[in-house]
Amino acid sequence: MNTAGRLLLLCLVLGLVFESLGIPVADDLEADRDTDPDEKDPSVHNYWRNVNCGGVPCKFGCCREDRCREIDCD
């Protein structure tokens, strides 16, 4: 048990040393693979659209239940 505690302490100290030196650890190396491709494209998250509202263009934000709420009418 004493050896396991020392080994754990050594690993923690080495991790802190490498982190302070700026050497990337395994979690930093995998950061590029963890990103969602939809996060890079902001148009995917744009829920606003222009709708013809009786000849007047209006901006609507649609819910999942297809109920629209008028946000801004020109």
Curated annotation (Swiss-Prot):
Principal subcellular localisation of the protein = secreted
Instruction: State the UniProt keywords alphabetically.
Output: Disulfide bond, Secreted, Signal, Toxin
Please list the residues that make up the propeptide.
23-49
The entry's localization annotation reads: Secreted
Among its keywords, does the record have Disulfide bond? yes
Q: What molecular functions are annotated in GO for this chain?
A: toxin activity
Protein family: Belongs to the conotoxin H superfamily.
Function, please?
A: Probable toxin with unknown function. Does not produce any changes in intracellular calcium levels in mouse dorsal root ganglion cells. In vivo, does not produce behavioral changes when intracranially injected into mice.
Instruction: Report the domain remarks.
Output: The cysteine framework is VI/VII (C-C-CC-C-C). Displays a mini-granulin fold, a structure composed of two short, stacked beta-hairpins connected by two parallel disulfide bonds. This newly described fold is derived from the same cysteine connectivity as knottins (ICK fold). The name 'mini-granulin fold' comes from the structural homology with the N-terminal region of the human granulin.
Q: What is this protein called?
A: Conotoxin Vc7.2
